[in-house]
Amino acid sequence: RPVQPKHFDQYWQAGILSWDSGIEMNLHGPYYAELLGNRRERNRSLAKMEASMQAGKIINARHLVYHVGPYGEYDPGTEANEQVANIFSGIVDRVRSIWGEQDEDAYTAFPWISEQEPSLVGIETSGRQELWGTVEEVLEVCNHVEGTVPVLNLGHIHARGHGSMRTSEDYAELFDMVRETYGGSKFYCHFAGIEHRMGNALHYTQIKKSDLKFEPFAEFLAEEGDWMDITIISDSPLLEHDAMYMMQHYDKARQRLMEIRARDERRIKLAKESGLTPEELELLEQEVAEAKTREEKEDSKSPAVTAKAPSKMMSFDSPEDDDDLF
């Protein structure tokens, strides 16, 4: 049965604001779910998800993000993935039917209904070994269910991989795998610092306190992200602070990349003017830098000349009156 979301007015106002200002809205469903549980547990989870599906229409959510929950009686593998695919196929159908329930008044209240597609259903990667949701599992289900998209929670992936996301190459490998398996250039991600142990996420933390650093991700985005249409959601306890922190580090990474490219362009130009190849000019610059380093080391090894301390002499001068110093 339909579940009327609470605080309807606030949801609707948020939808109108996002529509008028061009801000993309996304909505996260219940954080706890048991979609692989028995019928009672599954239906209870779906009933809670129903309210978020209706709220998604009211706020014009572009993505509705859901967790699957524990494996339950299933073992990781094909059977569990098929069950998840069947469940999410029904969820996609329900979302589309909610968006299709409309009348003439709805076009005025919800102008996006006639111009936007229904919300996409996001399936989020999990951060614990007992929960369904490895990257491979999520990609397999999304490939089989139209209307679903993978949600890459990078903190969860890092934790489940025993701290696997440490360099820009790690991110390149992950996104290349997603592109080859799922296709497309649109990506939806969550990012936050995370505490983890033995392949299990414990809790989110601010990015500065985590071994999951944003700088390598920013470096990857700056160098290879031109082909990507990516949305990054801050999951940090310091929500706005770490969102700005990520934006600043991405801007810094872009600036560094521009400086490197400008330097390389100058080197190529100088090489052409000098009649050298860029490689020969770079080798010459390295030799000059090494020679300068050797000179600095030799200068530091030479004995320093110390000034002779003045001999202490007995003075009979009376001390000056310092009362007028301040």
Indicate where each model-derived feature is located.
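Active-site beta-loop-alpha junctions enriched in small/polar residues
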Residues: 30-32, 69-71, 124-128, 155-160, ...
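Well-ordered, non-membrane alpha-helical segments in soluble/globular domains
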Residues: 5-11, 49, 81-89, 168-175, ...
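Hydrophobic faces of well-ordered beta-strands that scaffold small-molecule active sites
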Residues: 25-29, 64-66, 121-123, 150-152, ...
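Gly/Pro-rich active-site loop or hairpin
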Residues: 75-78, 132-135, 158-229
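Short amphipathic alpha-helices and their capping/turn segments at secondary-structure boundaries
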Residues: 5-21, 50-57, 134-146, 169-185
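C-terminal helical cap(s) of enzyme catalytic domains, especially alpha/beta-barrels
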Residues: 240-259
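N-terminal pre-domain/capping segments
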Residues: 1-29, 35, 39-54, 259-325
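Active-site acidic/histidine proton-transfer and metal-coordination neighborhood
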Residues: 20, 34-151
